[in-house]
Every structure is written in structure tokens, then in C-alpha cells.
């Protein structure tokens, strides 16, 4: 099964080797036919503390690194 890759924005870089990434998804509501935006936060592993708050990044699924970390930062995303 392929690993999922998501794009988002770093919302926090306070912890060592960890960033919080907010990923937004858009979908059309089935009844209202209106575009809805939902966001979810993921904690991702950042080995070298490279990324700072506000950076656009791509994250990929990985084996669990800690209690809450299941994602790794893959690369910086183009804005």
C-alpha cells in the first residue's frame, strides 16, 4: 500500500525535531453544494529542525516515531 503524501503549513516548531503541520482539505457538501474547508493538524518528524513556522511543506506517512508522530517532513512545498 502506498504511503500518503499531504501538503500543509507549519503552525508550530517549538519542539525539538517536531513540527505541527496544518493540512487543509476542500470538498463539496453533498446537500448544500457548497465548498467546505476543513483543516487537521499533524505532528511530523523534522530531523534537522529545518522548517520554521509559516513554511509550506509536504509530509509523508511513516512508522510511529512517538506517541503522536506518524508523519515525516518530506520536503518544502512550492507555494
Swiss-Prot record:
InterPro entries: NA-bd_OB-fold (IPR012340), Ribosomal_uS17 (IPR000266), Ribosomal_uS17_bact/chlr (IPR019984). One of its GO terms (cellular component) is cytosolic small ribosomal subunit. One of its GO terms (molecular function) is rRNA binding. It comes from the Bacteria. GO terms for biological process: translation. Keywords: Ribonucleoprotein, Ribosomal protein, RNA-binding, rRNA-binding. Belongs to the universal ribosomal protein uS17 family. One of the primary rRNA binding proteins, it binds specifically to the 5'-end of 16S ribosomal RNA. Part of the 30S ribosomal subunit. NCBIfam families: PRK05610.1, uS17_bact. This is Small ribosomal subunit protein uS17. The lineage of its organism: Bacteria, Pseudomonadati, Pseudomonadota, Alphaproteobacteria, Rhodobacterales. The gene is rpsQ.
